[in-house]
């Protein structure tokens, strides 16, 4: 066994760099935070080849004194804390004294700095070793150039993503810094091209416009809230302007960008029922608090923190956001419903969507599910006054369990289709071109009549109840999915071309993938200044073309892997949900045509969300319901 020995300073610096400097964006973050702590009002960042070739950060801050330059590049040397007490009262972004030493350990660093306007110093470090120091003319402030990142740790390079991805990570981190410090002017350039420029006039809305686009910034709501311990400020998107990812929520603590799941959930909770499922707001929320209430000494990146009075802060966030949104809405927030005690039920863990057609005289029935319900399923209360239906999954077949009130001891199991039919192999929501239409599994039904949103039909001796709205949704979904998979998606011209603004990050992603978007029927052209122009659109994007185009682009940007079949299924589902599908009285010809089309659909038994379309009632089932002897 090897003897215990002390590691060399060079090796310990490389180990520390592995925690602090994960990628080029980490270098940008650490250098910009140093500039902010130095009191800079102007920060310029330029990088080449995703930062691997060179990163330069220049500021007009306090600079580094000539006699302290060597110390600045020594591990655990800092001007920001001095005693143990300071560790629990941190008001700066940095404090660990690791950044410059860690950067120098894995790169070539040139620093030019001056703490006054009389003269400065220039130094070069290679792998933690100082190669040169000399006097140099320099205005007050610091300019640091980092080149050949990871030159002496090539294994780190294989863990980096593509050049485009690393570029986007740099843009994202500078965006967050700019949002946290609207009083500082940031300029970010890549290979000489400006990606972000803020004016430093302490105008958060203008900074959001520079990052996310003017169209979005103009519609954002002002957020204000306070308590004895916290002050909350920021801007929020309205509930109709959302994204499919939480990445557009920027949570700032005394100007520091942090990640905190519970606080993020509190922000989302503030929107209550105004948000559609799986949609998230765009929000910039800054929380000011006494540094004694937060511990930032948790992780080297300082993006994870521990908070005192976190529950109090969560409540303040949720309440403040709810009030800010309600001030600009005449619609009562569903958030208040969360405070109303629920009626006793044995299946509180399931979500209910109450059918608005249920008559006032319906008496609620408490019941117990016969098997463990699929937690992802939604349960709908029917218009029947004597039965509630619980949708469960059992051996890949749907079973409807009708349970009577407590005075009736018999139960009836109704199947939406003949249990002998084999429906295995169907995907829940994805249809491929090779799928076989299951026409033979649903018999030809004869229309009998309609009650509200339900059609009544028969085949032989059996009755069938068909949810009209769910049936139309199935047909609409199938049609849109077929259109998305056609070789040539028919287009309709816009009277006035639609100019779409994007965040700088999204613009760069979309600009490189314009050809891929054409496969989705979206033909965009570059319009410059973080904008793309749309001249034509698929007909099924009506009536709100812009909102639907943005939805498609949002889904495309946030897919984990490029799976176009899955993406098209998601798009078809979202478009179907956005189209207005209301129950209406059908004449017999229309009703019979609906039944015919449903029979020829990809799945006549459930819509694309898995909600039941049709229920079968045999004569035996009816006899049991009417308590007739078998």
UniProtKB/Swiss-Prot annotation:
Keywords: DNA damage, DNA repair. InterPro entries: DNA_mismatch_repair_CS, DNA_mismatch_repair_MutL, DNA_mismatch_S5_2-like, HATPase_C_sf, MutL/Mlh/PMS, MutL/Mlh/Pms-like, MutL_C, MutL_C_dimsub. GO terms for molecular function: ATP binding; ATP hydrolysis activity; ATP-dependent DNA damage sensor activity; mismatched DNA binding. Coiled coil: none annotated. The keyword DNA repair applies. GO terms for cellular component: mismatch repair complex. It holds the Pfam family HATPase_c_3. It comes from the Bacteria. PANTHER family: DNA MISMATCH REPAIR PROTEIN MLH, PMS, MUTL, DNA MISMATCH REPAIR PROTEIN MLH1. Belongs to the DNA mismatch repair MutL/HexB family. This protein is involved in the repair of mismatches in DNA. It is required for dam-dependent methyl-directed DNA mismatch repair. May act as a 'molecular matchmaker', a protein that promotes the formation of a stable complex between two or more DNA-binding proteins in an ATP-dependent manner without itself being part of a final effector complex. This is DNA mismatch repair protein MutL.
